[in-house]
């Protein structure tokens, strides 16, 4: 993660010329705030302040976590706190909540800004954004999750074992059960939490199980629509604290919760992945009801701590959110499990 942050910093370069009165501050000025030359970085920030519009809040928030010079980062946060009237304390979520509660408009080059910013972390990220990409969700709600594309590795046709050989599982461990045309399988939460996606052939069908560790949603999709198979992966980005998938062919971003493309050339073409039934159960109850079930082996080809509850243990030990959402429902605590 630290290496990724370092990769964003831009080299010293002459500051962008000051825009004419009433003109938008150019894209170059926003990226200039990341300059490793303090004079140039502060000059870029000054141009943004002088021509400030609320539409600049989104790119400034995305820059805030990457500014390499502490003094400049403090100035960026001060500008954002002044505009929003909120104190961040180093947590950007309250500032994002202010933004999402409004319709501030969008810088005309905002999509290109996201492409230019995040391609410095992973060049493949540019494929998600850019001026020509259609979107049906707010781009300022798409946040980087801190990993590269497929940095959370999916499980592909993983090794399955009979229930009697799964000595690593306790009866109270949580599994996601699938039963299709007599093919019965269990995918332990403790394993999927590290991979967030399993691509498996179940009852002769190529299916994708998508698990979002942060929000706890497990959904099984048939990724073939109209005879076209969409090979899915983990994009590295989230929308409202829920992972966004991407497909290998069009590099579209897909909603995990709806199974539809949300940023891509396919938007508006009626494409929707078919959902299939998944049962969240204890291992003891699942194998009692399905004696012939198979279950994921610990031999995944990856080195992880697959103990129950090990994945994201510190995150789930508090009610603090890693990524904010536009609206919280106070009737339940943050991260409360709902089955």
Feature-to-residue mapping (PLM):
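Bacterial N-terminal signal peptides
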Residues: 1-8
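Structural detector for internal amphipathic alpha-helices that build alpha-solenoid repeat scaffolds
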Residues: 14-21, 39-53, 62-63, 71-86
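Amphipathic alpha-helical scaffolding segments comprising HEAT/armadillo-like alpha-solenoid repeats
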Residues: 14-32, 53-65, 88-96
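Phosphate-binding glycine-rich loops and adjacent basic patches that engage nucleotide phosphates
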Residues: 19-23, 36-42, 57, 171, ...
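Mid-to-C-terminal functional-domain signal that highlights helix-capping/loop sites
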Residues: 61-66, 78, 82-339
């Amino acid at each position: 993660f630290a290496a990724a942050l370092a990769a964003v910093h831009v080299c010293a370069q002459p500051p962008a010329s000051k825009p004419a009165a009433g003109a938008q501050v150019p894209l170059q000025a926003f990226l200039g705030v990341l300059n490793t030359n303090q004079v140039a970085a502060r000059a870029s920030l000054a141009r943004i302040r002088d021509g400030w519009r609320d539409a600049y809040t989104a790119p400034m928030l995305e820059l805030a976590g990457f500014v390499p010079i502490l003094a400049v980062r403090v100035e960026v946060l001060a500008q954002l706190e002044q505009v929003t009237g909120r104190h961040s304390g180093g947590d950007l979520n309250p500032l994002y909540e202010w933004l999402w509660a409004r319709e501030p408009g969008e810088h005309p080059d905002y999509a290109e800004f996201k492409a230019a910013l995040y391609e410095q972390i992973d060049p493949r990220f540019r494929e998600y954004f850019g001026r020509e990409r259609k979107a049906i969700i707010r781009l300022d709600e798409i946040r980087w999750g801190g990993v590269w594309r497929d940095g959370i590795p999916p499980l592909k046709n993983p090794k399955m074992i009979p229930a009697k050989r799964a000595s690593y599982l306790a009866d109270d461990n949580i599994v996601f059960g699938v039963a299709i045309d007599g093919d019965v399988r269990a995918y332990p939460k403790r394993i999927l939490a590290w991979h967030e996606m399993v691509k498996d052939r179940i009852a002769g069908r190529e299916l994708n199980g998508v698990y979002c560790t942060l929000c706890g949603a497990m959904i099984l999709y048939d990724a073939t629509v109209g005879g076209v198979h969409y090979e899915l992966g983990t994009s590295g980005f989230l929308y409202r604290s829920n992972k966004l998938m991407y497909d290998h062919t069009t590099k579209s971003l897909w909603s995990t919760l709806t199974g539809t493309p949300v940023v891509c050339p396919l938007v508006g073409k009626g494409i929707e992945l078919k959902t299939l039934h998944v049962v969240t159960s204890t291992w003891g109850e699942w194998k009692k009801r399905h004696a012939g079930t198979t279950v994921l082996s610990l031999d995944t080809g990856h080195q992880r701590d697959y103990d129950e509850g090990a994945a994201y243990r510190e995150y789930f030990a508090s009610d603090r959110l890693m990524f904010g959402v536009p609206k919280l429902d106070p009737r339940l605590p943050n991260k409360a499990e709902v089955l």
